[in-house]
Amino acid sequence: MFSKTIVLLARPGLSDKGKILINPHSALMMNITMPTWCVFDDTVDCEDSAENFAKLYALDILGYDVAIGYPMDNRSRLEFYRLGDVSTSTVDNDAPFVWGMPTFLAPLHPDAGNTLYQHPAMTNFLDRTMAIFASPDDSTCVGTIVGTGEHVSLQEFCEGKQRFVKQAGGKGFSQIINFPQKSDVIDVIFENLEYFSGYYLPTLNVQSVVHPIWETRFFVVNNTIITSSGRIVSEFPKFGNNASGRYGIKQFSDGLHDDNATENPYFDIMFNYAQHIVDNMSATGESLHYVLDVAIHDDDDINTVGTPFVVETNGLSNSGLYGCDIMALAEAYALDQCDHPDVTIGGLRSIDSNVMR
């Protein structure tokens, strides 16, 4: 099926843990709690394995996210790359393990700080305000407004506003907060927030709140939209005047390939918007693989209802592949690898981001 090795591997999506058969050749079983990638060399019947794994994990196991394995030249053994600290595992071969952040999750460029939103091509599409606070020296720490470069104090940005606070480098913490007008109270809120969340203030960013009603994840391989994971209907359970910030996901289906899925009246608008962004990103000249989450506004105070906006961007290597055409994605990725034999370790030129709802 593929001219070079590629294997699809599952990870638990709705549960915290799961046992997954990874390699039938060695009957390798292990507990997986974070994304894991598997690499086969051509010596391991790679074409048959790739096709079988694709069908097994993409089509038969429900409730799992799927990650893509990739080819490595001059290798004859399994290799695994993990995100996070997986405490225990059992293997029956001498496969090496790399703990922590894999090397293929490199920044787009040296100054990007592993965040796509700082890239000029993406900044133009962020239509909400986000402040990144770089110093916790005192309660008046200065943040930078993304897109304008304007400096702002914590109090100025939050006084009397509803803000979304999240961990900048991941998904470990997020909360919507209604801030009062009093600066001294805002100071206390952030002091408590840092203490109870366990996250150092520089690892948090503060954003204006958006209420999306439809969301679609577009999967991009080599600057081309290959498939999508849409139409996600987002509902915010209300508590008084506040949104909980949690999505009620009603449906997953591939808007690019499902002819019967017509429920999303905004899909064409969202796709054209995503394509416009992808075209701008392709001007970097890099072969980029990433996911782009696009949603529709439900708040005239932010923008006209029906206006698309960027919710989140992530590298393809650490994204949930919910509901997309996994075979189309795998095939596109395999073809890209054949077209770019000069790719170094990991073979996956990825971009990462902390732009989130």
What are these regions (language model features)?
Residues 1, 29-30:
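Universal eukaryotic N-terminal targeting presequences
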